[in-house]
Structure formats: structure tokens, C-alpha cells
A protein has these predicted regions:
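Transmembrane helical bundles and short interhelical boundary loops of multi-pass, membrane-embedded
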Residues: 2-4, 10, 225, 239, ...
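Membrane-integral, polyisoprenol-dependent glycosyltransferases
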Residues: 3, 8-245, 278-376
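Short extracytoplasmic/periplasmic juxtamembrane "stem" segments immediately C-terminal to an N-terminal membrane anchor
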Residues: 51-58, 254-262, 411-425
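Membrane-proximal, lumen/periplasm-facing interface regions of secretory-pathway glyco-
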Residues: 74, 306, 384-427, 436-447, ...
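Membrane-lumen/periplasm interface segments of specific transmembrane helices
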Residues: 192, 224-263, 394, 398, ...
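Hydrophobic alpha-helical transmembrane segments
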Residues: 264-276
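Short hydrophobic beta-strand segments
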Residues: 427-437, 486-494
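Aromatic/acidic, Gly/Pro-rich catalytic loop(s) in extracytoplasmic/lumenal soluble domains
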Residues: 457-524
Length: 524
């Protein structure tokens, strides 16, 4: 640790002040994530709907939509879906039923736990004030607030990687924490398939670094660490063998290793590197991946003032690593860079958006906090207070925007009003026709169609396919336009649809959020 980092005293160095700030920041971060939870975003995303429906099916019927018992990886759309969030949803669904806020609980809990984890990690690698700043920056970060409030399964990855790193750093002081680190890193493999090649590299580099400085040694805890990781990774290794055709799929009454309809390995390649770097640059510079459900254009992923601080913080961590090498000293701040540097090649393997490269974002937020903190150590400690005040003002502005304009702007993407539209249609029609652009997974979720009924009645547009599109199941039909409207049917369509033919046929219309329902009274 540099001398400058040790020479901060005054009001913010008082233990009572820092404890108060810790609880204030944690409370503000949790409030930003739980206020109107389940209502904003208002509606349901197709992937979280599928994860929730699969959890409900596994809980009540013992199989998923592909007929597998407890699969290690969900078949879902045809080309697969990460399974951990689905399994984490099951206890909440068992307690409270299949509801939107219920299936978002795992993401909320992991996000809230990430706040004290970031504090504790940076406190141990730098110091307490830096830890408070890291926690504060993550607590108010637009990207992290947004991901915490809906249930995209891939967005669990940053949290579990953070937990894995935190317990690994603790293991340098007490080897017993290696067991928890192995558990967190092992679980991270079930959050996002894209990180499979990178997690072993992250772990290996951390092991080499700590063993080089004699912070870890060959012991029973290290052996257990490796054993736990191997056991947790083994089902996924078998999954790869199954899907590359080396062994048959595995079906048992306890768990399954499925053969997917389509393996998306072709999505990972080093082709079009220039285009991928351009996309990455756009995300880092504009902080906008053009997907409003990930990145609010008005404020950016991390606020637009953040990247210079992040660059400064990255330089600080690299500097710590270099100083440690020269002096042959253990510098735990060096490990903060490992996940970021190892994750960078990911950007060359796929076309980036905020979800696909999400493992880079918590390190970026921590770097930004360290950049602001280190700037205060080489200038004046009040600089950190000033920076925090600017961010607090941005946070207040973002919160107002998030619960007003942003809520309105995202409603169509989350199919706001579809649940109510389906309820009306169920009362008014024997058959229900739904606009073909609607995702069938949302209909499954809201109607809670038994999985055996779905499996026995579903008709797909193309089968097999990497992204299955249902034409119909049970009494639900996904149609282009009502060429010849049926009197006994109800029609659900976007609110801006052409209704001329239905009006001519004497249909009645009811409006629900982004949808309208057309039907004939008494089916006449």
C-alpha cells in the first residue's frame, strides 16, 4: 500500500462515521432496488417468463417444457438457457406462487448482497474509505439497479463472480474461505454459459498469484477447493460431451443432461474482430447498448462521468501490481484486475451488449471508485466528498427518471397489460388469438398452462430450431391477422394495430396497457 493511501485522517476516518455511512449507503441501495419492486419494470420479459415457467413446471410436475427432470441446462427456446436462476426461483414460487415479483426475487437478493460484498472486498484490498466508495458507486449504478429489478438469468453472473473473488481474498487470511469461494465460482458456471472458458482462467491466475506470495499453500482446503470446483463443473463437462456428440444424453429421475436442439457454440468466435471492438467501444464510450432494458440512454450504464475515474482506478490497480512485483509484496488490489483483464477477450468472441459482457461491469464500477479515491489521496480528501456529492445528485435524477419516463418507455418491451388482456380474453373467447410477435413464454407464465398440456398440444413454426416459435398450444393461437374473424374467439393485439376488419364484423374492444382485446359479446 502506498504511503499516500495511509495518510487520510479527519471526520471520515472516525469509525462511528464510517459505520453510519455504511448503513446509509446500504439502505439507499436496497431502497432503490425494492421500491415498487415487481411493478417497475411493469410487465414481463420473455426470458424471465420462461425461467419462471420452467421453475413452476419443475416444482409442480417434475419436468421442464422439454420433458427433462431437473436438467443441468434448460433446453428452453431450443438452444438452451442457464439453469441456476430457475432453481433459485423454486422456493419462492413454492411459498408465494407464480407471480412476477416472486420470480424476480433471486436477482434482487443477489444484487443487494453484492453491495456489502463490494464494500468488504475493497476494504480488504485497499481500505475502509475505498470500500465505502465502492459500495456507494455500486449502490447508485444505473446498470446494477436496473438488473436487480427483473430476472434475466445471465445477470446473476456478476454477483456470483464477485462473491467468489471476495471469499478468495478472505482465503488469503483464512484458508477455510476457499470452500465458499469454490461454491460461488462453481455456481457462477450455471449463471451464464459464455463465461465457462474464463472462470477457470480467473481462478488459476488468482491461485498462482496467492501461492507465489505464500498466501496460499498446498493443504486440504486447497484440495477441497479444487474438488468442489470439479464436482460442480462435471455436469457441465458432461453436457458439452453430450452436445458435441461424444456421449448420449443422460436422463434419470433425479437429474438430466439434455441434448439441445441447437448448440450455439458458433456464436463464440474471433471473426469480425474489428466490428466487435467497435461495438465494445460504443458501449464503453456511449454507455448505451441500444437496449433500453439494459442501459438508460439519459444516464448511461454507470453515469457519463464514470469512465475517466474507472481508467484512473485501473491504472492504480496495475500500479499496485507492479509495485508488488518489484518489492515482492502481496498486493491484494492486484486481484481486482484479474476478472476484468481475463474478461476482455470475451468482447472479441461475441458481439457485445450490456448482458453479454456483464462480467466486466462490477470491476469497472470498483475501478471508478478507486479512481476517485486515489485522486483524493494525491490532492485533498475533500475531493472524494465532492465526487460523492456529484454522484448523489446524479443518482437522485436517475431515480426520478427511472420511475417516470423510463418506466413508460420500457412498458412495450415488457408487454405491459398482457396479463389483464389474457384474463379478459379467457372470459370472452373459446379460442384466443394473440399477435404473432408476442412471445409464447409470457402466455405460458400468465396462464399457468400445465406443462403436460403444453407439450401435448404445442405446434412450432419450425422444429427443430435454435429459437422455437410456437404457432399454437392448448386454445391459444399466434396469428398474423384475422383473415376471417371467428365469432367465438377473442383477439389480443398491440394497441396500435389495424382493427378495421374486426370493427366491420362488430367486435367489441377493451384496452389494457399496451394491448387491446377484441371479442363479440356472448360470442354473437
Amino acid at each position: 500500500m502506498t504511503k499516500a493511501l495511509k495518510n487520510n485522517d479527519g471526520f471520515f476516518e472516525r469509525e462511528s462515521t464510517q459505520k453510519l455511512l455504511f448503513w446509509l449507503v446500504l439502505a439507499a441501495g436496497i431502497f432503490a432496488r425494492v421500491y415498487r419492486f415487481g411493478l417497475v419494470p411493469n410487465g414481463l420479459n420473455q426470458d424471465e417468463a420462461f425461467a419462471g415457467y420452467e421453475a413452476w413446471s419443475l416444482l409442480n410436475y417434475g419436468i421442464d417444457t422439454a420433458g427433462y427432470h431437473n436438467p443441468v441446462y434448460l433446453t428452453a427456446w431450443g438452444s438452451g438457457m442457464n439453469a441456476l436462476e430457475t432453481y433459485l426461483m423454486i422456493p419462492f414460487i413454492a411459498l408465494f406462487g407464480l407471480k412476477v415479483w416472486v420470480i424476480r426475487m433471486p436477482q434482487l437478493i443477489v444484487a443487494c448482497l453484492s453491495l456489502p460484498a463490494a464494500y468488504s472486498l475493497v476494504k480488504r484490498t485497499v481500505d475502509r474509505r475505498a470500500g465505502l466508495m465502492a459500495m456507494f458507486m455500486l449502490a447508485i449504478c444505473p446498470w446494477h439497479i436496473i438488473l436487480s429489478r427483473w430476472g434475466l438469468e445471465s445477470n446473476l453472473a456478476p454477483g456470483f463472480l464477485l462473491f467468489g473473488l471476495y471469499f478468495f481474498v478472505r482465503a488469503a487470511e483464512n484458508e477455510r474461505y476457499l470452500l465458499l469461494s469454490a461454491l460461488m465460482y462453481g455456481l457462477s458456471l450455471y449463471t451464464y454459459a459464455t463465461i465457462w472458458p474464463f472462470v477457470p482462467v480467473i481462478i488459476l491466475l488468482q491461485l498462482i498469484y496467492c501461492m507465489a506470495y505464500k498466501k496460499l499453500r498446498f493443504s486440504r482446503y486447497l484440495l477441497l477447493f479444487v474438488l468442489i470446483l470439479f464436482i460442480m463443473a462435471l455436469p457441465l463437462l458432461l453436457f458439452l460431451l453430450v452436445n458435441y456428440g461424444y456421449i448420449d444424453e443422460i436422463r434419470t429421475s433425479f437429474f438430466s443432461i439434455p441434448k439441445l436442439l441447437y448448440m450455439r457454440s458458433s456464436e463464440l468466435s474471433f471473426d469480425e474482430k474489428a466490428k466487435k471492438l467497435e461495438l465494445l467501444g460504443d458501449i464503453f464510450i456511449t454507455q448505451n447498448d441500444k437496449n433500453i432494458w439494459n442501459s438508460p440512454e439519459k444516464y448511461g450504464l454507470f453515469y457519463y462521468i464514470t469512465m475517466p475515474f474507472a481508467l484512473f482506478g485501473l491504472i492504480f490497480c496495475i500500479r499496485e501490481f507492479v509495485i508488488g512485483l518489484r518489492r515482492h509484496e502481496y498486493r491484494p488490489a492486484s486481484m481486482l484486475t484479474v476478472q476484468f483483464i481475463v474478461g476482455l477477450p470475451l468482447c472479441l468472441l461475441l458481439k457485445a451488449n450490456a448482458t453479454k459482457i456483464n462480467i466486466l461491469f462490477i470491476p469497472i464500477v470498483i475501478f471508478a471508485a478507486l479512481g476517485a479515491y486515489f485522486l483524493s489521496t494525491v490532492t485533498h480528501r475533500r475531493v472524494l466528498t465532492g465526487v460523492a456529492c456529484i454522484y448523489a445528485a446524479l443518482f437522485i435524477g436517475f431515480e426520478v427518471y427511472y420511475f417516470t419516463d423510463y418506466d413508460e418507455d420500457t412498458r412495450a418491451h415488457f408487454s405491459y397489460g398482457l396479463e389483464q388482456a389474457l384474463e379478459i380474453a379467457e372470459e370472452k373467447g373459446e379460442k384466443i388469438y394473440i399477435d404473432q410477435n408476442e412471445f409464447y413464454t409470457k402466455v405460458l407464465f400468465y396462464t399457468q398452462t400445465p406443462v403436460d398440456v403444453f407439450r401435448n398440444t404445442v405446434q412450432y413454426l419450425y422444429y427443430p430450431a435454435p429459437y422455437l416459435h410456437a404457432l399454437s398450444f392448448d386454445h391459444y393461437y399466434f396469428w398474423v391477422s384475422p383473415y376471417q374473424p371467428e365469432d367465438a374467439a377473442a383477439y389480443i393485439m398491440p394497441i396500435d394495430s389495424d382493427t378495421g376488419l374486426l370493427e366491420e364484423e362488430g367486435f367489441t374492444f377493451e384496452y389494457c396497457g399496451c394491448y387491446m382485446v377484441a371479442y363479440k359479446e356472448n360470442g354473437e
